[in-house]
Curated annotation (Swiss-Prot):
Reaction it catalyzes: S-(5-deoxy-D-ribos-5-yl)-L-homocysteine = (S)-4,5-dihydroxypentane-2,3-dione + L-homocysteine
Gene3D superfamilies: S-ribosylhomocysteinase (LuxS)
Superkingdom: Bacteria
Obligatory cofactor(s): Fe cation
NCBIfam families given in the database record: PRK02260.1-2
Annotated function: Involved in the synthesis of autoinducer 2 (AI-2) which is secreted by bacteria and is used to communicate both the cell density and the metabolic potential of the environment. The regulation of gene expression in response to changes in cell density is called quorum sensing. Catalyzes the transformation of S-ribosylhomocysteine (RHC) to homocysteine (HC) and 4,5-dihydroxy-2,3-pentadione (DPD).
Residues the record lists as binding Fe cation: 54, 58, 128
Protein name from the UniProt record: S-ribosylhomocysteine lyase
């Protein structure tokens, strides 16, 4: 099995909250797709609660589009990481990390403005696979944490696992 890009970086050295360009690729038509690692928690030290990350998934996708789409950028998808330490965001375009960080902070401020669980988009049995597994309070705690911190930049070159370490890990 090929080594995926997300496993070629040293998770013991990642900062959070932080933005990282996880991957860029070009489509056959010449569009650039950029995948961002939006790291909310320090890997192996912190984790977002399942109800909070699920609620945040419903809110974050729309709020990030409100603040980032336009000027050559269109978000394709924002999805939580299985490890519950962040989200991956795929988009068309090449915004710099600061633009992404600013949109992220604005989206977190929007999460804090949601006053009632009934305002969570697509929170029903028809549009959500686990519609009862939500917590607005937990999502807002996550948002407060991001707003209380500086969003940094994680750099792939600085985080790259050395070839020796990859060999040691049998990868």
């Amino acid at each position: 099995m090929p080594l995926l890009d997300s496993f070629a970086v040293d998770h013991t050295r990642m900062q959070a909250p932080a933005v990282r360009v996880a991957k860029t690729m070009n489509t056959p038509h010449g569009d650039t797709i950029t995948v961002f690692d939006l790291r909310f928690c320090v890997p192996n030290k912190e984790v977002m609660p399942e109800k909070g990350i699920h609620t945040l998934e419903h809110l974050f996708a729309g709020f990030m589009r409100d603040h980032l789409n336009g000027n050559g950028v269109e978000i394709i998808d924002i999805s939580p990481m299985g490890c519950r330490t962040g989200f991956y965001m795929s988009l068309i375009g090449t915004p710099d990390e600061q633009r992404v960080a600013d949109a992220w902070k604005a989206a977190m401020a929007d999460v804090l403005k949601v006053q009632d669980q009934n305002q969570i988009p697509e929170l029903n049995v028809y549009q959500c696979g686990t519609w009862q597994m939500h917590s607005l309070n937990e999502a807002q705690e996550i948002a407060r944490h991001i707003l209380d911190c500086d969003i940094r930049v994680n750099n792939n070159t600085e985080l790259a696992l050395p070839k020796e370490k990859l060999q040691e890990l049998h990868i």
